[in-house]
Amino acid sequence: MTKKKAHKPGSATIALNKRARHEYFIEEEFEAGLALQGWEVKSLRAGKANISDSYVLLRDGEAFLFGANITPMAVASTHVVCDPTRTRKLLLNQRELDSLYGRVNREGYTVVALSLYWKNAWCKVKIGVAKGKKQHDKRSDIKEREWQVDKARIMKNAHR
């Protein structure tokens, strides 16, 4: 009988796209796998990824991640030509792809990458169907966030 591996401390999250939640209303989230090359996996293990400008395009019945930047490590990629911003294929079920096609074809909707993380030994990306926010929506979100902080401060001082 084999022993269970000890859980490694640390976060499984590689990269977050905080700007996406500020710029868009996220209506639905999907988890997708990524088709990666060897040097990309090694760079992701080192945490050298940025998905702040990334988005998903659907074409020919497949989904592709554009704009994600995975910086190559100097020691990992000496004999391979590395393109840090290459297009990466997303691995989704046909049912999930059909759902994405149906939602994105509506006016004003897009698909953005929300986070990049490890699930067991596999690299996953969380994508969301998003609708752009107007300026007044962003302001109301900031006011709501500030009110939550003020409310927490008031409650903390009330218990003293």
Swiss-Prot record:
Q: Determine if Cytoplasm is one of this entry's keywords.
A: yes
Q: How is this protein organized at the quaternary level?
A: Binds tmRNA. The SmpB-tmRNA complex binds to stalled ribosomes.
Name the Gene Ontology molecular function terms of this record: RNA binding
Keywords linked to the UniProt accession: Cytoplasm, RNA-binding
Where is this chain's protein located in or outside the cell? Cytoplasm
Organism in which the protein naturally occurs: Escherichia coli (strain K12)
InterPro entries xref list? SmpB, SsrA-bd_prot, SsrA-bd_prot_CS
- Source gene? smpB
> Which NCBIfam families would you find in this protein's record?
PRK05422.1 (NF003843), smpB (TIGR00086)
Name under which the protein is recorded: SsrA-binding protein
Effect caused by changing residue 147 to K: 97% loss of tagging by trans-translation, binds tmRNA normally, altered binding of the tmRNA-SmpB complex in the ribosomes A-site
What's this chain's function? Required for rescue of stalled ribosomes mediated by trans-translation. Binds to tmRNA RNA (also known as SsrA or 10Sa RNA, 363 nucleotides in this organism), required for stable binding of tmRNA to ribosomes. tmRNA and SmpB together mimic tRNA shape, replacing the anticodon stem-loop with SmpB. tmRNA is encoded by the ssrA gene; the 2 termini fold to resemble tRNA(Ala) and it encodes a 'tag peptide', a short internal open reading frame. Able to recruit charged tmRNA to ribosomes. Does not play a role in transcription, processing or Ala-aminoacylation of tmRNA.
Additional remark text? Although the Fu et al., electron microscopy paper indicates this protein came from E.coli its sequence maps to T.thermophilus. The same situation holds for Ramrath et al.,.
Query: Null mutant: what phenotype?
Result: No visible phenotype during growth on solid medium at 16-42 degrees Celsius on rich or minimal media, no peptide-tagging of proteins translated from mRNA lacking a stop codon by tmRNA, i.e. no trans-translation. 4-8 fold increased susceptibility to a number of antibiotics (norfloxacin, gentamicin, trimethoprim, tetracycline and streptomycin but not ampicillin), very significantly reduced production of persister cells. A number of bacteriophage development defects.
Q: Which domain of life is it from?
A: Bacteria
Give the chief site where it resides: cytoplasm
Question: What is the similarity comment for this entry?
Answer: Belongs to the SmpB family.
- Keyword Transcription among UniProt keywords: no
UniProt GO cellular component terms: cytosol
Biological-process GO terms, alphabetical: trans-translation
The record, for Pfam families, names: SmpB (PF01668)
